[in-house]
UniProtKB/Swiss-Prot annotation:
Function field: Hydrolyzes the pyrophosphate bond of UDP-2,3-diacylglucosamine to yield 2,3-diacylglucosamine 1-phosphate (lipid X) and UMP by catalyzing the attack of water at the alpha-P atom. Involved in the biosynthesis of lipid A, a phosphorylated glycolipid that anchors the lipopolysaccharide to the outer membrane of the cell.
CDD domains: MPP_YbbF-LpxH (cd07398)
Pathway annotation: Glycolipid biosynthesis; lipid IV(A) biosynthesis; lipid IV(A) from (3R)-3-hydroxytetradecanoyl-[acyl-carrier-protein] and UDP-N-acetyl-alpha-D-glucosamine: step 4/6
EC number: 3.6.1.54
Similarity-based family: Belongs to the LpxH family.
Protein name: UDP-2,3-diacylglucosamine hydrolase
Cofactor field: Mn(2+)
Keywords: Cell inner membrane, Cell membrane, Hydrolase, Lipid A biosynthesis, Lipid biosynthesis, Lipid metabolism, Manganese, Membrane, Metal-binding
Chain positions recorded as Mn(2+) 2 binding sites: D48, N88, H123, H204
Annotated GO MF terms: manganese ion binding; UDP-2,3-diacylglucosamine hydrolase activity
Pfam hit, one: Metallophos
InterPro entries assigned to the protein according to its UniProt record, in alphabetical order: Calcineurin-like_PHP_ApaH, LpxH-like, Metallo-depent_PP-like, UDP-diacylglucosamine_Hdrlase
Cofactor note: Binds 2 Mn(2+) ions per subunit in a binuclear metal center.
Length: 258
């Protein structure tokens, strides 16, 4: 399994779903980047930073909203290590983007060796095994051959395809139960058992919480990162997780501003 040893306070945030229609969320994220650079020893972003990512070549002619976000990440990465993860929306994030930002690609899953101990980190969609249709889609788009064919298309073609896929996904999700779209408990237990860890952190489900489990007679924890929406949600929402020698603590974006 991939391992990453990091010391000091680690900040984690995921599921920002940044795009042209999320200026307030982007502004809040830029604030997080600045705060993390001041207070954290590393920032980890395990997936769905962007609502869609059709290939790293978009940065060569980035629209204003994207250019501002990239500049914010680049500035933070100049001060602390920043790790970019791939989610179900931005699975095409690659080395070109990481290099352009001075950031690192976050392997998935990854075993973090922290001041608090060993922690398993991943985006989380791989645990939603009850949603068989999504798992088939995930396997397809993670296939290197499919990705090569997609990236060979023009940017307008890729944008149109991504928009169509997003619409189909939203329509399909409306017909699915919330339970199907959540993680499968057996999949989570298997991951904890295989990694031999007591703490799992993931995003994806947009259900921030700390779950206490018992697996093989051991107390384990599953921490779910919050999603962000400062543009369309009322009240706005978002947050991040801090891991340090004292443990894990989740901070709410709105409460922290107050």
């Amino acid at each position: 399994m991939n391992k990453l040893a990091l010391q000091g306070p680690l900040w984690l945030a995921s599921d920002l779903h940044l795009g042209p229609a999320t200026p307030a969320t982007a502004e809040a994220f830029l604030g997080l980047l600045q705060a993390a650079a001041d207070e954290a020893s590393a920032l980890l972003l395990p997936g769905d930073i962007f609502d869609a990512w059709i290939g790293d070549d978009v940065i060569r002619a980035a629209p204003p909203w994207l250019a501002a976000v990239l500049q914010g990440i680049r500035a933070a990465a100049g001060r602390i290590p920043v790790y970019l993860g791939r989610g179900n929306r931005d699975f095409l994030i690659g080395q070109e983007l990481a290099d352009a930002l001075g950031a690192h690609l976050l392997p998935e899953p990854v075993l973090l060796e922290t001041d608090y101990g060993r922690i398993l980190l991943t985006h989380g969609d791989e645990y939603c095994t009850d949603d068989s249709a999504y798992q088939q889609f995930r396997a397809m788009v993670r296939n290197p051959q499919w990705q090569a064919q997609f990236l060979a298309m023009s940017i307008p073609e890729r944008l149109a395809m991504a928009e169509q896929a997003r619409g189909e996904s939203q329509a399909a999700n409306q017909a699915k139960s919330m339970e199907i779209m959540d993680v499968n408990p057996a999949s989570v237990e298997a991951a904890l058992r295989e990694a031999d860890v007591d703490v799992l952190v993931h995003g994806h489900t947009h259900r921030p919480a700390r779950h206490v489990l018992s697996v093989d007679g051991r107390k384990r924890e599953r921490w779910v990162l919050p999603d962000w929406d400062c543009d369309h949600a009322d009240p706005p929402r978002g947050g991040w997780l801090v891991i340090d020698r004292d443990g894990l603590q989740c901070f709410d974006l709105v409460e922290d501003e107050d």
